[in-house]
Amino acid sequence: MKKPLLLFFVFIISFNYYSQGQQLHFTNQYLQHNSMYNPAAAGIANKNMIGISYRNMWSSFPGNPRTFMIYADKALEKLNAGVGAYLYRDETGPTSRTGAQLAYSYHIKSNNSNNKFGLGLELRALQFALDKNKLNASLGSDPVLAGSSNKLAIDAGAGVYFTNGKLSAGAAVSQLIQSKLTLANVPNASSSGKLYRHYNFNMNYKIQTGDDIYLIPNALVRVIENSPSEYEFGMNVNYQEKIWWGLGWRIDQFWTLQAGLKILNRVSLTYSYDYYQTPLSMFSGGAGAHELGLKFYLEKPAQ
């Protein structure tokens, strides 16, 4: 298959993906990114940190999807609150998304000091861009190519979250406003060119199997308007909060293997690999996804 045709194929997938399907930046290390999926989780773990991550999918394809993120999470204990922030850039073929996400959570403690409830709000900004120079000149009559090269959209979300140190669970909705997002120069275009609401439901539970080892079964469900729902389940093993490994499965999409370690109680490193069950698997090599995350703790986390 010629490279220009492959590039156009990737463009069609990515434009359709962002205009009608899942439009939020993605990580398979979601246990490391609670506030990314739910603003109410911001600061609730009381682990002040900053981090970076890089995700590389389907490397055998030209213009394969890549995601870069920098993020932070901080508890505001005097205010019974927490804040979280994400800056990210997605690149897929000739398309790219650059975005920012700010989250604020108010924390409510019950009489049992281990029980915490979070009520959160988030603000998102997304710039979707198209590099027309990367597309074949023969596609010049396409209405998408006749439109603007970039589009900025602002949206918001909200969530609730609960944790008691063992059980954590939450529900959130992103892109409540459903701002318009289309590059096509087509009169009376359908409403599909917009940000769709994403509903996220998550739960995990720590099971102590010894003095030093925890099993953590976890689940994440995404309900996306105008797109199939996604169900992700996993099991992690954590040893002394210093070494962890796990297995995950997103139904009908991919399996995930991941492992990580903490260095000097101030730095943690996590690597994961996705093996896709989709038709991409027919291509030899490069049809999976690699993700690497690095966190820097601003204070020594409580053990």
Language-model segments: residues:
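Short, basic/polar N-terminal leader/transit segment immediately after the initiator methionine
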Residues: 3-5, 22-23
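Positively charged n-region of N-terminal signal peptides that target proteins for export
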Residues: 1-4, 110-112
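Subset of outer-membrane beta-barrel
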Residues: 20-303
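Sec-dependent N-terminal signal peptides
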Residues: 4-15
